[in-house]
Amino acid sequence: MHVVPGLKVLYFGTPVVLISSLNEDGTANLAPISSAWWLGQSCMLGLGNNAQTTVNLLREGECVLNLPSSTMVDAVDRIALTTGKPAMPDYKKKQGYRHEPDKFSTAQLTEQASDLVRAPRVAECPVQMECRVVSAHPFGGPEPHATAFEVEVLRAHVEEDLVIPGTHYVDPLGWDPLIMKFCEFFGGGRNVHPSRLAEGWNMPHQLQSTTV
């Protein structure tokens, strides 16, 4: 039997993306998001208008989409409630966000030079996609609170072990992306780590960690 619970959150499960971009002073920003999907060589990204990443993409017109594996959940969670913006709205403060100018160090991840864009890649991520912004659209009703970005993938870097030998394809059995479902982290179909984001958003469930 179906019910109509009036769902407040519609995050049914998408891969976590670490977006690296450049701040106005040339330093790197790093932000985890899960509002992303791909079609052909393009990707659609959903970002809140109060995010430093949104400001950076509108100004610079480029970024890198870094896809972490499920084993990188610790690094992702370290920056889950951080922002590159010194000033933040009250609702973010109440959720526990803090300003962090050096996200790479906080996440304990390494900057790696890109080939075609100025923003760095995340060396530890098995998949890295250098992108340019094609368009940006207001998103979220009559008073948009977010921006939908269309980006073109200029170059994709993939760990050699993940590529099916002799082909241009990723091995789906070898690739275990970090998935976010309803603000919780999953990999291989299991909850893999407690989520700071779920705590900040007061999600009404507590899942048991089965970290590998």
Question: What function would you assign to each model-found segment?
Answer:
Residues 1-212:
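Basic, polyanion-binding surface patches
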